[in-house]
UniProtKB/Swiss-Prot annotation:
Protein's cellular compartments: Cytoplasm
Main location: cytoplasm
Coiled-coil blocks: none
Gene Ontology cellular-component terms listed: cytoplasm
Protein name: Oligoribonuclease
InterPro entries on file: Exonuclease_RNaseT/DNA_pol3, Oligoribonuclease, RNaseH-like_sf, RNaseH_sf
Pfam families the record matches: RNase_T
PANTHER family the record matches: OLIGORIBONUCLEASE, MITOCHONDRIAL
Homology family: Belongs to the oligoribonuclease family.
Length: 181
């Protein structure tokens, strides 16, 4: 597939916590859509190995959530480093968008960007500096059209690929019902 400046790269990461200075990325995936939110391609879901010392430092919410999903065990068994994941995702992006053409797309995407800037800086630099954040529409809709906001159903699996697909679905919902495009 050729690069297209109108393509959007959607991203989600699972992390060991919320602080990029002490916590680490443990799972990441990307989806490419066209400007109409049609899915064009999915990256592999990359589970990133982290040492036990990092995993042991997770708070109860993260231990419980990532333990139930099986992600902690996958992280322990993974041989993929952050640097390898960064390179694979960079190569994936290069197939679909030119450098600095796509905003970083997702839900509360600034948090993913913070971790990416800390642990995958080359990948972060390939994105445009803008974000396309579904959570902005969510917050506006809750305040301006709460009856529409109630129509959004969140499954909250906290798995990278599932969360991206849910974000795209949520954006489609806001486009149709809130923005009416």
């Amino acid at each position: 597939m050729a690069q297209d400046t109108n393509n959007l790269i959607w991203l989600d990461m699972e992390m060991t916590g919320l602080n990029p200075d002490q916590d680490r990325i443990i799972e990441v995936a990307m989806i490419v859509t066209d400007s109409n939110l049609n899915v064009l391609a999915e990256s592999p879901v990359l589970v990133i190995h982290q040492p036990d010392a990092i995993l042991d430092g997770m708070d109860d919410w993260n231990k419980n959530t990532h333990g139930k999903s099986g992600l902690i065990e996958k992280v322990k068994n993974s041989t993929v480093s952050e640097a390898e994941a960064e390179q694979l995702l960079l190569e994936f992006m290069m197939q679909h968008v030119p450098e600095r053409a796509t905003p970083m797309c997702g839900n509360t995407i600034h948090q993913d960007r913070r971790f990416m800037a800390r642990w995958m800086p080359k990948l972060e630099a390939y994105f445009h500096y803008r974000n396309l954040d579904v959570s902005t529409l969510k917050e506006l809709c809750k305040r301006w059209r709460p009856e529409i906001a109630k129509g959004v159903v969140k499954r909250g699996k906290h798995e990278a690929l599932a969360d991206i697909l849910e974000s795209i679905e949520e954006m489609r919902y806001y486009r149709e019902h809130f923005l009416k495009v």
